[in-house]
Amino acid sequence: MSVTIPQKDNQSLNKAGMGNTVRIAGVDEAGRGPLSGPVVAAAVILDPTRPITGLGDSKALSERRRRELFRLIRANAWVGIGIAEPAEIDRLNILHATMAAMRRAVARLPVRPTLVLVDGNRLPPGLPCPAEAIIKGDAKEACIGAASIIAKTVRDDLMEQAARRFPGYGFEGHKGYPSAAHKAALETSGACPIHRRSYAPVRAALESRFSTNANRCG
């Protein structure tokens, strides 16, 4: 899965009172908990001359408002997207895959940040500048809130695309999270190529289907 985010015009982001040009990137992710689909990270550098009101935790926003803010962020900020696919999540584990996605998001910013603020209590290794982890940062720092909005919106769109590729799982509704309907579809249809086979509910569904098929053969 690949995502292209149109960028604003290349211009300096000057933070008042700091003297030198300062580019602060907020970083957040979406999709650690689902049983299927990628984890998506976003890095956003806001332009202080183009303020955007209402930025915050994407989970606290209605879908309509989140998409309005998504369009505003794309038009008025620099954005980088990083993705870790299900196979990478299974190979590395979700924590390390998330760190990789965050690092890619920062690397794909069109300008290099001077400081990175990451939501949570861990920092991805290999960032190109000083960084700080902020617990509940999406509610405290506008740039992290913006990254939260970008990451969730991009991931939701990817899961809606997945729903068309793999009908019957309801990805357009639950977005891969472990809802009752999703678990029932797993039991009925088994895992599809975007399921995370290292996750216990997916593994249990696969083992159950294997056991059922083995009993039928026996």
UniProtKB/Swiss-Prot annotation:
> Which Pfam families does UniProt cross-reference here?
RNase_HII
Where would you say this protein principally sits, based on its record?
cytoplasm
Q: Quick one: which residues bind a divalent metal cation?
A: D28, E29, D119
- Coiled coil ranges (UniProt) are none
Q: What is its EC number?
A: 3.1.26.4
Cofactor (UniProt): Mn(2+); Mg(2+)
Could you mention a single GO BP entry for this protein? DNA replication, removal of RNA primer
Asked if the keyword Manganese belongs to this entry, the reply reads yes
According to the entry, every stretch annotated as the RNase H type-2 domain falls at 22-211
Q: How is the cofactor bound?
A: Manganese or magnesium. Binds 1 divalent metal ion per monomer in the absence of substrate. May bind a second metal ion after substrate binding.
Q: Subcellular localization, per the record? A: Cytoplasm
Could you list this entry's UniProt keywords, alphabetically sorted. Cytoplasm, Endonuclease, Hydrolase, Manganese, Metal-binding, Nuclease
Catalytic reaction list: Endonucleolytic cleavage to 5'-phosphomonoester
Q: Where is the signal peptide?
A: none
Statement: the UniProt record of this protein carries the keyword Transcription regulation:
no
Sorted alphabetically, which InterPro entries does this protein's record hold?
RNase_HII (IPR022898), RNase_HII/HIII (IPR001352), RNase_HII/HIII_dom (IPR024567), RNaseH-like_sf (IPR012337), RNaseH_sf (IPR036397)
Q: What class of enzyme is it?
A: hydrolase
A GO CC term assigned to this protein in UniProt: cytoplasm
Q: Name one GO molecular function term.
A: RNA binding
Similarity comment: family membership:
Belongs to the RNase HII family.
Which HAMAP family does the UniProt entry name for this protein? RNase_HII_B
NCBIfam families the record matches: PRK00015.1-3, PRK00015.1-4
Function in brief: Endonuclease that specifically degrades the RNA of RNA-DNA hybrids.
UniProt name for this protein: Ribonuclease HII
Q: Which organism does this record belong to?
A: Maricaulis maris (strain MCS10)
